[in-house]
């Protein structure tokens, strides 16, 4: 059984509230879970201490027993000092796409042609 530490949504419409739960990876997002490990209230201010509440002792226990946190939960665990989140580095993502590079090359070519025409006219 693959275990995940993930968020289960609660609250009402447009007023989200999430429980940090340990669940089987195959169960639905808000479905059956094994243990409630904390909560996250995104409606509170970012510096509010009650915004993210975690049971660090139980989370460490489950991480040691093979549970995998989701990306968002891993961010919370990294902030709390419970688990280490590796920074992702994707230098290719910052590069413009193929079409954008073609448009930039065309624009540079037109500017060079215009400069050459202006020099020839003088």
Curated annotation (Swiss-Prot):
Compositionally biased spans, kind Low complexity: 111-122
Molecular function GO terms recorded: structural constituent of ribosome
Domain of life: Bacteria
Region (Disordered): 85-122
Alphabetic keyword roster: Ribonucleoprotein, Ribosomal protein
Positions with biased composition (Basic and acidic residues): 99-110
GO CC, one annotated term: cytoplasm
InterPro entries cross-referenced by the UniProt entry: Ribosomal_bS16 (IPR000307), Ribosomal_bS16_dom_sf (IPR023803)
One Pfam match: Ribosomal_S16
GO biological process, one term: translation
Keyword hit for DNA-binding: no
Family indicated by similarity: Belongs to the bacterial ribosomal protein bS16 family.
Stated name of the protein: Small ribosomal subunit protein bS16
Species assigned in the record: Rhizobium etli (strain ATCC 51251 / DSM 11541 / JCM 21823 / NBRC 15573 / CFN 42)
Gene that this polypeptide is encoded by: rpsP
């Amino acid at each position: 059984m693959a275990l995940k530490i993930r968020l289960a949504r609660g609250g009402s419409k447009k007023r989200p509230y999430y429980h940090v739960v340990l669940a089987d990876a195959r169960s639905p997002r808000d479905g059956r879970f094994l243990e409630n490990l904390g909560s996250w209230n995104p409606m509170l201010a970012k510096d509010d201490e009650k915004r993210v509440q975690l049971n660090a002792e139980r989370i460490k226990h489950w991480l040691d027993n093979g549970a995998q946190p989701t990306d968002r939960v891993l961010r919370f665990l990294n902030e709390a000092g419970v688990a280490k989140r590796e920074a992702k580095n994707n230098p290719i993502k910052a590069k413009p796409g193929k079409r954008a590079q073609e448009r930039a090359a065309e624009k540079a070519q037109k500017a060079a042609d215009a400069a050459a025409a202006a020099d020839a006219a003088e």
